[in-house]
Amino acid sequence: MAVFPIGSHFAPPHQLTKRHVIATSSPISISTRLPQNVSFSKVSGVTGSTRLSKHGVLVRAEDKIRSSSSPSSLDEPIDEDLMDSSGLCDPLCSVDEPSSSYFEANYQPKTDIIKALAILAAALTGTAAINHSWVAANQDVAMALLFGIGYAGIIFEESLAFNKSGIGLLMAVSLWVVRSIGAPSTEIAVLDLQHATAEVSEIVFFLLGAMTIVEIVDAHQGFKLVTDNITTRKPKTLLWVVGFVTFFLSSILDNLTSTIVMVSLIRKLVPQSEYRKLLGGVVVIAANAGGAWTPIGDVTTTMLWIHGQISTLPTMKDLFLPSVVSLAVPLALMSLTSEVNGKEQDPKDVLASEKMAPRGKLVFGVGLGALVFVPVFKALTGLPPYMGILLGLGVLWILTDAIHYGESERQKLKVPQALSRIDTQGALFFLGILLSVSSLEAAGILREIANYLDANIPNVELIASAIGVVSAIIDNVPLVAATMGMYDLTSFPQDSEFWQLIAFCAGTGGSMLVIGSAAGVAFMGMEKVDFFWYFRKVSGFAFAGYAAGIAAYLAVHNLHFEIPTTVAQIPFLTGS
């Protein structure tokens, strides 16, 4: 999924006091402070502070440090008036005196009035244009232009200083207004909108529930159960261990959370070096590969799963081997580099780890079980996956209320506080972009594009592979959503080669550029890695893994080879 870290909206560096990165001692804290002078956004852009973003689990790292960092973590003393009753730093602590002075010195009310008038004029112009008779007569062209303008605004969000969630919502509403004007009747447009809203809401509810569960587990430091068991200091061994731990962690969690957890770990284990950056690149590749082979591992596979293009067991069985190959090939190639073949890490350089929250193991077990139980719930009841995730959230909510009853100092460990930390603006962007794509589907535009591709590129493997490459540059959510609208289940049935390749390619293709996935963006911010370093050091390995994974998938299907799913199917155990 593409991210464009274009521009920054901070005061000039020479007028700001440089902030030092607060390095948490925890190997797994998602609240690791990111460098404030690195601007990057994935799906929801926020100016003025560094933020992570990836659909449902987006802008957390910067916000959570404000609630989890103690005043002693900062380089400069903090005014006691800026602290709450619990001693935690108020968000206003992040505004230093030089930046406040810069704001006061450069505040110009006239400029704000001009901006407001410009936005009002643009809104009135848009309203007049939509009501023009040309729009009704040329619905397809009008909607294509609107979508192109809106998508350009999303891509260049940082340059325009507009949040892409707002742009997405405006684009969605505008497209449906045009659709209602051009439809045979308003009633037909309303029915189409109701159908689209029902489908999109399932995904949004699922993501909100999953985000909250992960947030609760993280608040209890539950991921330490995984990361504390990584004790090796040998560079080559650590490379493979970090890669495959991230791979399996990402198959259950989202790839953003997995990346922050694992990058925080390697910052604890390895001092600042080229080798540590390379380990971070491995985390990005592994997080994207791990999310591609399970229905809950990546937002695009979740979309395909919820809408019925793929199912649980066939997807896991058919995509597991290609996903492993897409990770193993880069790991094997990286093992030959000089950075990996260095000396063993000195144990004295390892940072101390902070303690797990009370009942952290219990919360980790229940939270992980709630996520894994969702496919089982769907298979047992036939109900949509979001009902399963809401069931798990409800159980975890009651559990945390019970185990922290009467503990006023542990309110941050409860669900209401977790809900305040998850990124709802990312969910709103997701709502906007999917409603926008559904309007194009309702108007028949996506079907026309599909017919054009079928006529000119009849090879479905090539189409899926191209989507993966493009997803390294352009957001893969609208890409996959558009593909779902272009091809229905009558063209390609559930679990067909096309849909499985789409799931794999869209999930792993983003590893080829650091801005191509939320995992890469998180790594870029946490380790101060720039686009060109990643392109020189990691992109080639990621592309090799991507191509090898596609080749492995096609080879398995063309040779009709099946991965054994039971003991009886393993030849050397059955004597066959």
From Swiss-Prot:
Single GO MF descriptor: antiporter activity
Phenotype on disruption: Decreased biomasses and lower chlorophyll levels after sodium feeding. Increased Na(+) levels in chloroplasts in high sodium chloride conditions but impaired photosynthetic performance. Altered levels of phenylalanine and tyrosine.
Pfam families noted in UniProt: CitMHS
GO CC terms in record: chloroplast envelope; chloroplast membrane
Feature: transit peptide: 1-60
Transmembrane segments: 237-257, 279-299, 320-340, 357-377, 379-399, 426-446, 462-482, 501-521, 541-561
Mode of membrane association: Multi-pass membrane protein
Tissue expression as described in the entry: Mostly expressed in mature and senescent leaves, and, to a lower extent, in seeds, roots, shoots, flowers and developing siliques.
Any one Gene Ontology BP term: response to salt stress
Location of the protein in the cell: Plastid, Chloroplast membrane; Plastid, Chloroplast envelope
Family, similarity comment: Belongs to the NhaD Na(+)/H(+) (TC 2.A.62) antiporter family.
NCBIfam families according to UniProt: NhaD_1
Role description: Na(+)/H(+) antiporter that extrudes sodium in exchange for external protons.
Name the UniProt record assigns to this protein: Sodium/proton antiporter 1
Organism, scientific name: Arabidopsis thaliana (Mouse-ear cress)
